[in-house]
């Protein structure tokens, strides 16, 4: 089953733009990974896996931190207004310490 | 709104399990409970305005479908939602926040309840509960807004 309707070039552009958003938060974000898939009832979806610094997680209230990052992704990628709007975005967060412990390949 | 607020309180407690309590089960129940807190908040508000007996209202509450509520939420986020009144009410930003959290929590709830391969961490549960709290705050600001009333009646 196809998990994306985007061309290889679109996927490459999308990945580059995701990295650019991550760079806007140098003190808060270690990296952002993403994948195209289907959600629980089969709708096209983008899953963002956002690795945040331990310092940011302690310094900011979590809703403020995650809200700023999500707003950045939604606005800069046009997640509800562009060709990507067919995909439902889902956002998940981990701290670097969590990932160092879990070593989850999807988050590397 | 007692049940919705009680569920939110419970979700918050489960997000920070005491030492010795099962972490994975607590995080999963926290996320699932946060979703149901928001679900019941919206459903109860929707049926409040319906002039039936309390028994009939409870029956009506059971008719709300998760998938349709997700579809309505997604159409709100993509500015494609239209209410039943003409002209269609302007969608306030607060309603978009509620819609965004609802969709996100519903997916997280499915994973929390059924994906046993996924390992959850504290930030997952705390983040989802915080999102639910944000949705409660935003909903309480606009619960009587025409767009809020009409989107609930479409679910």
Task: Give residue spans per PLM region.
Chain B
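Terminal alpha-helical segments
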Residues: 1-155
């Amino acid at each position: 089953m196809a998990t994306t309707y985007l061309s290889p070039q679109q996927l490459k552009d999308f990945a580059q733009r995701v990295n650019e958003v991550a760079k806007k938060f140098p003190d808060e974000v270690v990296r952002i990974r993403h994948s195209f898939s289907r959600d629980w009832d089969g709708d096209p979806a983008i899953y963002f896996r956002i690795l945040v610094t331990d310092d940011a997680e302690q310094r900011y209230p979590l809703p403020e931190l995650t809200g700023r990052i999500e707003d950045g992704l939604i606005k800069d990628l046009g997640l509800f207004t562009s060709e990507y709007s067919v995909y439902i975005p889902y956002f998940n967060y981990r701290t670097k310490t969590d990932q160092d412990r879990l070593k989850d390949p999807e988050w590397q | 709104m007692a049940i919705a607020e009680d569920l939110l309180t419970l979700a918050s407690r489960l997000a920070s399990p005491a030492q010795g309590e099962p972490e994975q089960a607590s995080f999963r129940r926290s996320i699932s409970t946060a979703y149901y807190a928001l679900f019941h908040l919206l459903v109860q508000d929707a049926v409040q305005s319906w002039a039936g007996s309390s028994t009939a209202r409870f029956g009506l509450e059971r008719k709300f479908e998760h998938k349709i509520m997700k579809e309505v939420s997604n159409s709100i986020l993509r500015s494609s939602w239209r209410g039943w009144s003409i002209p269609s009410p302007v969608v306030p930003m607060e309603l978009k926040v509620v819609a965004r959290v609802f969709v996100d929590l519903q997916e997280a709830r499915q994973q929390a309840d059924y994906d046993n391969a996924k390992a959850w961490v504290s930030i997952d549960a705390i983040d989802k509960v915080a999102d639910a709290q944000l949705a409660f705050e935003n909903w309480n600001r606009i619960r009587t807004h025409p767009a809020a009333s009409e989107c609930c009646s479409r679910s």
